[in-house]
């Protein structure tokens, strides 16, 4: 079987919005004192999210009031293998998942910033790779097929939000923060994994730098399982929150 290429990796990074509808997963971070809790989440596209600690403490239920995508919204240009060659750009189309705490959450679920660069996140050019991608290797991640690559950001890298990019980059930090909030030493590269079935970024890991090993590790537990409305209901004030679930 032919190993995936850097172009395959980029195409998978573009594809998440069109590869799944519901997701249950856990995620934990390394090397970040602000994100030191392991979480479990249930996400139902386009606008429902439930987040708990892995011990069952309910942290937040998000119920956005998002209008369904207009039937006239353009569809992506696909490759013969079904991965996305070019994402549509239209005000009629919104593919962002509900956010928990920061846009890092949105970016790991839809890691388009790892595919194409440009002048802004919404104006991307497939001819401007966001990353320099070393050999792509098929691996197992949490019992699921994934593609792993060691990558480096290019001058075209444009994260969804500069304050919480998937990959820390000196240029992006300077644009976002000026002389503040800089790393003492930036990573030489990053290890990144994309889940093949969903396109979700399931791993980032800094290689070298002042905080080696920093990143996130997401483990997918279920894809496209039914998720009832009752799962996305906050308990009434005063109810015991730990482990509370209307579907138990």
Residue ranges and their predicted role:
Residues 57-60, 67, 155-156, 209-211:
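Short, surface-exposed beta-strand-loop junctions and turns on beta-sheet-rich folds
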Residues 37-42, 147-150, 155:
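Exposed beta-strand-loop-beta-strand "reactive/processing" segments of non-cytosolic proteins
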Residues 19-26, 47-50, 142-150, 200-203:
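Short, hydrophobic/aromatic-rich segments at coil-to-beta transitions
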Residues 129-132, 141-144, 155, 169-190, ...:
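Non-transmembrane domains of secretory- and envelope-associated proteins
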Residues 39-41, 50, 60, 189-193:
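Short, surface-exposed charged micro-motifs
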Residues 1-47, 74-108, 126-140, 176-180, ...:
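N-terminal leader/targeting segments and the immediate start of mature chains
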